[in-house]
Amino acid sequence: MLIFSVECMNLFPPILQKYIQKNQYSNWLIEPIPNRLYNCIIVIPALAELENVKKLLLSLSENESTYFNDTLILFVVNNTISVSEDIKLNNKLTIEYLNNLTSKYTPITNSISIVTSELQVAFIDASTVGKEMNDKDGGVGLARKIGMDIALNYFDYSSRIKKIFICLDADCTVEKNYITAITEYFQKESCKAAVVNYEHNIYNMNENTAAIICYELFLRYYLLGLQYAGSPYAFHTIGSTIVCDYESYVKIGGMNKLKAAEDFYFLEKLSKITKVHSIKSTCVYPSSRPSFRVPFGTGQRVNRFIAKVRNEYILYNPQSFVILKKWLLLFDSLNKTNLKPILTEVKRISTDLYHFLNENKFEQFWKKICLQDLKDQQIIKQKKFWFDAFKTLKLIHYLRDHGYPVINMFDAIDKLLELFGVNESVKRNEDILQDLDKQKEYLLLLRKLQNN
């Protein structure tokens, strides 16, 4: 592992100069200061994650080392001012561990393979007194933003090789070709943004196993529905799977400061300026634990499942995606067409769709499009911006609440697979809610369909 001690000078491209000036941080810096520049920087927020940081670094150290010298692994150890003393202590120990790991003077027992690897590790202290994030903005979004914004100073802009950000979480592990597969995909493909394949661990039989199988089925079912409908937003939105180049990052104004769903909105903005690819040649393994860290997402869904607050074995009605598909086919075909026949066709598809579009001011949007002197590509762009990932989800929720209620999870999956024309199926019996092996079969089938 290389040791950083000398501050690097860097020449910023014009696209970056204004962004850097606007997003400066006097309170935070990379420690130790890197003595070189990189083509890839992996940014990892860490909140009370000492043991998981060690596991993740061990996992990364077992990667193919081809691109280690060009890759910086950057932890953002963070908390807000008002967190518990236990969290502050864990973060303090995490910073001490990372500081020792990057110091040539302090040997680290039980981390020899990490120390002797060529992994290049650094951290940002957003935890100790005077460096904490404020309670109003502090959270995973701001932690990612701090790391990514500061990391912009340490890309090698003199190199023609693409400069990429990889987003990861401290409670993940990764496949052994993770760094290589992502780096080479971006260098070989015309790619500016991507999501990496993910899989939760479903083989350790504990109280979380049923919860995480159920949650991943929910995630993959929604994605399958979007794929069936032909949505341009058919990609999973998990923070630990996001990759993008620095130019796209800057063009969309960087990472947001949201305490949750920062990944959803970040990817939505990326998808409005470039295609979001799917990297299927490697895999991230997120944690399946309960968590207090964000108000919703994996950890909270596991919490809710274990608490038995509600029936978790339900999914959106497959007919919602049929309506979405018909709407997208109509919407994509529109080109300054008179509004009346459009609305007539919308009503033919679904009166609930008509009411949704009316409530979301589709008529005003379309009249504005028709009044402007726009070329075909500009119209396509405006349509994509208007009916975005969030409005897509709003439509599915609207249909759920207006005539297309949620149904049994496995009935929904069977029906959507049938609509998709998938010949494979899972033979199940009535007690599937008690049969984790059959539930795993469903999940493995969805993984197979989405990873091929």
Briefly describe each language-model feature range.
Residues 2-66:
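N-proximal low-complexity "stem/linker" segments adjacent to membrane-targeting elements
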Residues 2-11, 304-452:
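Terminal low-complexity segments of carbohydrate-biosynthetic enzymes
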Residues 58-70, 82, 97, 101:
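Short, acidic, metal-binding catalytic loop of nucleotide-sugar glycosyltransferases
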Residues 177-212:
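Conserved donor NDP-sugar-binding/catalytic core segment of glycosyltransferases
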Residues 87-161:
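Active-site-proximal specificity loops/subdomain of glycosyltransferases
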Residues 161-162, 169-184:
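Acidic donor-binding/catalytic loop of UDP-sugar-dependent glycosyltransferases
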Residues 258-265:
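Acidic donor-binding loop at a coil-to-helix junction in glycosyltransferase catalytic cores
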Residues 223-243:
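A recurrent flexible, glycine/aromatic-enriched loop bordering the glycosyltransferase active site
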